[in-house]
């Protein structure tokens, strides 16, 4: 029996395998997510194989010459503890070598492991859950001078520019795929001139049992704007809804609590090198934990 690990670039035909792994781990992958990840950086996703058996996977997205992100680090249960995960890890880190900053999202149980590789904790990310009946939840405050519009009601260039000023690194290719994927619904806050003042997306996701929804990203100029966007995203979506909020935006917790969400888990954002310097006070929900 072949015992040599082969690490190959992720093929489209590999995606159903990863979806099943992620679903079983409780990651609640969104429909279409992994296709988007693969198309964001074709050189930055890999599968490990022993013969014809899939062993594990990892992604290392190189956004530019300043920033990269490691995610989707999974090893199938039967292959754990045999060094295959380390080989995948080394492949990802080699791909991002030379970058001044690399980020990842870690389970608490993995904090010490990543620290040994030079990563340091930055903040806590909280996963929130709402059991929605699909009704519209009116925000506590009114929002004058802005319209809540579907994604088709605002130019993508406006949304791209808004996102680029609030993320560690511009991500135009990823965001284009994210905004236009047919599985999701996008809403934005626009002023009378059509300028973007916030946006969010909700997409169907695969839970361990059944299906639910994931919101992300969620960005807005103000907490009031975030609340109105959240209300629009939740409306007409029944069932389990998840959103991941960044710990560095202390106002996000209150917005989500006011909207009926409850915390169900936490992860740790970690960086190797100089952490991003920009503020994320206007980021209330992360697009996904796999790509940062």
Residues covered by each model-derived region:
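Ligand-binding pocket scaffold of soluble enzyme catalytic domains
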Residues: 7-10, 15, 21, 26, ...
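Amide-forming acyltransferase catalytic core, primarily the GNAT-like/NAT-type
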Residues: 16, 119-214
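A short helix-loop-beta-strand connector motif used in the catalytic cores of GNAT acetyltransferases and
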Residues: 30, 35-56, 67-69, 101, ...
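Conserved beta-strand in the GNAT
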Residues: 47, 52-61, 68-74, 194-208, ...
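Conserved acetyl-CoA-binding loop-helix of GNAT-fold acetyltransferases
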Residues: 75, 81-94, 112, 116, ...
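Active-site/acyl-donor-binding loops of N-acyltransferases
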Residues: 106, 117-137, 203, 217-219, ...
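Flexible loop/N-cap segments at domain edges
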Residues: 189, 194-203, 207-245
């Amino acid at each position: 029996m072949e015992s040599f690990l082969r690490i190959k670039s992720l093929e489209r035909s590999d995606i159903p395998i990863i979806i099943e792994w992620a679903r079983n781990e409780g990651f609640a992958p969104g429909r279409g997510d992994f296709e988007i990840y693969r198309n964001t950086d074709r050189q930055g996703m890999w599968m490990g194989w022993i013969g014809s058996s899939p062993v594990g996977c990892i992604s290392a997205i190189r956004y530019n010459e300043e920033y990269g992100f490691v995610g989707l680090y999974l090893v199938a249960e039967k292959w754990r503890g045999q060094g295959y995960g380390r080989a995948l890890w080394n492949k990802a880190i080699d791909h991002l070598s030379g970058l001044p900053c690399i980020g990842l999202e870690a389970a608490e149980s993995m904090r010490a492991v990543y620290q040994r590789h030079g990563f340091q904790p930055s903040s806590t990310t909280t996963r929130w859950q709402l059991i929605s009946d699909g009704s519209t939840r009116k925000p506590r405050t009114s929002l004058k001078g802005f319209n809540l519009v579907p994604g088709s009601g605002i130019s993508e260039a406006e949304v791209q520019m808004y996102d680029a000023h609030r993320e560690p690194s511009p991500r135009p290719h990823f965001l284009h795929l994210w905004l236009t994927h047919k599985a999701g619904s996008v809403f934005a806050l626009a002023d009378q001139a059509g300028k973007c003042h916030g946006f969010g997306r909700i997409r169907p996701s695969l839970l361990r049992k059944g299906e639910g929804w994931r919101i992300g990203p969620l960005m807005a100029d103000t907490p009031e704007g975030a609340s109105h966007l959240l209300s629009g995203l939740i409306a007409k979506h029944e069932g389990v809804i998840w959103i991941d909020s960044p710990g560095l935006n202390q106002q996000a917790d209150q917005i989500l609590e006011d909207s009926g969400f409850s915390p169900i888990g936490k992860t740790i954002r970690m960086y190797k090198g100089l952490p991003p310097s920009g503020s994320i006070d206007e980021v209330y929900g992360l697009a996904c934990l796999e790509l940062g």
